[in-house]
UniProtKB/Swiss-Prot annotation:
Residues annotated for Zn(2+) binding in this entry: C462, C465, C480, C486
Keyword Repressor: no
Active site residues of this protein: K135 (n6-amp-lysine intermediate)
One record GO biological process: DNA repair
A GO term from the CC aspect: cytosol
SMART domains according to UniProt: BRCT, HhH1, LIGANc
Gene transcribed to yield this protein: ligA
Protein name per Swiss-Prot or TrEMBL: DNA ligase
NCBIfam families (alphabetical): dnlj, PRK07956.1
Source organism: Acidovorax sp. (strain JS42)
Positions that bind NAD(+): D47, A48, E49, Y50, D51, S96, I97, E133, R156, E192, K313, K337
Domain BRCT: 645-731
PANTHER family assigned to the protein according to its UniProt record, in alphabetical order: CHROMOSOME TRANSMISSION FIDELITY FACTOR 18, DNA LIGASE
GO molecular function: DNA binding; DNA ligase (NAD+) activity; metal ion binding
Family that this chain belongs to: Belongs to the NAD-dependent DNA ligase family. LigA subfamily.
Length: 731
């Protein structure tokens, strides 16, 4: 379903309730953006906007650790497994590395200071020894060798589960298919698949000669090649590989290596036949990290491959183990990026895009400009207030930045008389007094703006459906009020409803939804369950067998859970976690639909804004009609008594999961605990009742022991779920 324009007439809550509401909103927004980026390949915001929201969420959760939940984007590695490739569960998770947002020298100093603080080093202690490496702009890969032979290659995926791409990786000549004698019985090598710039240029030249579509940049070309279902296509793409770490390895006691340092491990990888970047070096303390960052930055354009920063890692593996992890990322490593590349171009127009939630986003239509390996023709302006703050008008010369070297945004207008110019023969921004290298003349930017150019105004009617455009009090975003009546929202509402975490309708992807909505085959969610074989089979690229598969998936999705159904409706501010809380508290959909704001406020983690959103949503007759039609189409779930949640065996308990359990995955353990009424938290505090710890538990286990909180192993968890007093302390 969609959200309505009048969902939030109530004033914002204050104090901790306001913080909880803000955290919940940030999580839901970040999850939507991540789904658009990693699964749909249709990002709606620049990387910089995502990073800002992510950092804001990190800051809030750091200040309010009791509000951290396991399903927060900060507690997991982002990504997704693509359909068509076999899922592979990583035995050792492929964690991401924290990105230092400060691109100056102080970024390296801040990391070094954090490490020294975590290690409790006195000011006069010797410098910490690090390994400094380039940060490759490619696709993370895990190579598993058993008995010295490559048996599996898998992408990062979401960090826990990746994609099996062994058939494609075998075509990469830099990756050895077998290793020399003396390697461990089990060896997982982690690294990056990438494409050299010269190979990328040659590939695009061949594409042009054949009349085929060219690739945007080396990273996209490499990622697309690795994810091919046909390895013959991959073999025609010139891919390369750099190794930079290890996953699962046979323990030293069983014949595995006994490395003392990260640098020593890299040297051993080289001896085993894996390519390691020539720039890798040992650095003593922050000063040498800064020097490395500056040197590699100066060499960046001359390197044969793309990088978007450098990586620092504590060299001592013993210190790495001492520092541990912060669930999502290691404390002993950081990625230190370079300032985003910036160019100058002209604003030729300002268009408006309408998103799934009905948000209207002004987008600058630009004179084409080449920024960071991509020709940019559009850049987001975020919202009307941001546009006015930057004072952007049609005809202006603007600075365009590829935030994170991936997605473009307008930084601001180049003011007249600012002493800036563009380098002749390019759009590179330089000082007007000289050229970039002292040889090419620099042309001053255009003069003052013409006085008759009007300010941009947000349209009063939606450019897609003509419905009224509204802006809620206290919000910066304008929204279309059309809901499901707006085709722009209709498509994304259907995709949201069909996604894996909601109704899980396999095969109902973006291209099929485009045809169904554009062809007026469906107008509302219940129309999905009224589809027939003939209406589907006549669509483009939809043979009878494919159509039947979609119908089977739709039929299968009818049997769901109340939480999934609620999440799938797309009620604003109701994410996956809130939907579960509502289902557990009320037990029945009718009870939720008829609940007043005060009743909704009794639900765990539901504040005034969310309560008002839910109440207003179900107060709309057309929303209730859609729900009733879905039930009439056969969508069903098990319901329980409204008070059942209070009688659950673990009701009121807070449990923290850490480490790797022998047989249960984290999601499975979380589901078991939540179904028993427990709250699964992401951090340990005095309010924690139990900590369930597996292998490599890290700092959470240490904190639990420090606070005297009972620690359970997997057997203890099962005992707790059975209602048997567990034998704490076994982990």
């Amino acid at each position: 379903m969609t959200e309505q324009s009048d969902l939030f007439p109530a004033p914002a809550p204050k104090g901790s309730a306001l913080v909880a509401t803000k955290i919940k909103a940030l999580r839901e927004q970040l999850n939507r953006w991540a789904h658009e980026y990693y699964v749909q390949d249709t990002p709606s915001v620049p990387d910089a906007e995502y990073d800002r929201a992510f950092q804001q969420l990190q800051a809030l959760e750091g200040a309010y650790p009791d509000l951290v939940t396991p399903d927060s984007p900060t507690q997991r590695v982002l990504g997704a497994v693509l359909d068509g490739l076999t899922p592979v569960r990583h035995r050792v998770p492929m964690l991401s590395i924290r990105t230092e947002t400060d691109t100056e020298a102080s970024g390296a100093q801040a990391f070094d200071a954090r490490v020294r603080r975590e290690l409790k080093l006195p000011p006069d202690a010797p410098p910490v020894e690090y390994v400094a490496e380039p940060k490759f702009d490619g696709l993370a890969m895990s190579l598993r060798y058993e008995g010295g032979r490559l048996v599996q290659a898998a992408t990062r995926g979401d960090g826990e589960v990746g994609e099996d791409v062994t058939h494609n990786v075998r075509t990469i000549r830099q990756i050895p298919l077998s290793l020399p004698a003396g390697v461990p019985p089990v060896l997982e090598v982690r690294g990056e698949v990438y494409m050299r710039r010269a190979d990328f240029d040659a590939l695009n030249e061949r594409q042009r000669e054949k009349g085929d579509k060219t690739f945007v940049n080396p990273r996209n070309a490499a990622a697309g090649a690795v994810r091919q279902l046909d390895s013959g296509i991959t073999a025609q793409r010139p891919l390369s590989f750099f190794a930079y770490g290890l996953g699962e390895v046979t323990p030293a006691a069983e014949g595995g290596p006994d490395f003392g340092t990260h640098f020593g491990m890299l040297q051993q990888l080289k001896e085993w036949g894996f390519p390691v970047a020539a720039q890798v070096q040992i650095a003593q303390g922050a000063s040498e990290l800064i020097a490395f960052h500056q040197r590699v930055g100066a060499e960046r354009d001359a390197l044969p491959y793309d990088i978007d920063g450098v990586v620092y890692k504590v060299n001592s593996l013993a210190l790495q183990r001492q520092l541990g992890f912060v669930t999502r990322e290691p404390r002993w490593a950081v990625a230190h990026k370079y300032p985003a590349q910036e160019m100058v171009t002209r604003v030729e127009g300002i268009d408006v895009q309408v998103g799934r939630t009905g948000k209207l986003t002004p987008v600058a239509r630009l004179a084409p400009v080449f920024v960071g390996g991509v020709t940019v023709t559009n850049a987001t302006l975020h919202n009307l207030f941001e546009l006015r703050r930057k004072k952007v008008r049609v005809g202006d010369q603007v600075i365009v930045r590829r935030a994170g070297d991936v997605i473009p945004e307008v930084v601001g207008v180049v003011p007249a008389g600012a002493g800036l110019a563009v380098l002749a023969g390019s759009d590179a921004l330089v000082d007007a007094a000289s050229s970039a290298d002292g040889t090419a003349p620099a042309q001053p930017l255009a003069g003052p703006r013409q006085p008759y150019v009007p300010n941009f105004r947000m349209p009063r009617q939606c450019p897609i459906c003509g419905s009224a455009v509204v802006r809620e009090p206290g919000e910066v975003n304008h929204r279309c009020s059309g809901g499901l009546f707006c085709p722009a929202q209709r498509k994304q509402a259907v995709l949201h409803f069909a996604q894996r975490r909601a109704m899980d309708i396999e095969g109902l992807g973006e291209k099929l939804v485009d045809q169904l909505v554009d062809g007026h085959v469906i107008r509302t969610l219940p129309d999905l369950y009224r589809l027939g074989l003939s209406s589907l089979a006549q669509l483009d690229r939809m043979a009878e067998k494919s159509a039947q598969n979609v119908l089977d998936a739709l039929d299968k999705s009818k049997r769901t859970t109340l939480a999934r159904f609620l999440f799938g409706l797309g009620i604003r501010h109701v994410g996956e976690a809130t939907a579960k809380d509502l289902a557990r508290h009320f037990g029945q959909l009718d009870a939720i639909m008829d609940a007043g704001v005060e009743q909704l406020l009794q639900v765990n983690d539901v504040g005034p804004v969310v309560a008002e959103a839910i109440h207003t949503f179900f107060a709309q007759p057309h929303n209730r009609e859609v729900v009733e039609q879905l039930r009439a189409c056969g969508v069903t779930w098990d319901e329980s008594e409204p008070a059942a949640a209070a009688t659950l065996p673990l009701a009121g308990m807070t449990v923290v999961l850490t480490g790797t359990l022998p047989t249960l995955g984290r999601d499975a353990a979380k589901d078991l605990l939540e179904s028993a009424g427990a709250k699964v938290a992401g951090s340990v505090s005095k309010k924690t009742h139990y900590v369930v710890a597996g292998a490599d538990a890290g700092s959470k286990l240490a904190k639990a022991q420090e606070l005297g909180i009972p620690v359970l192993d997997e057997d203890g968890l099962h005992a707790l779920l059975r209602g048997t007093p567990p034998n704490a302390g076994g982990a």
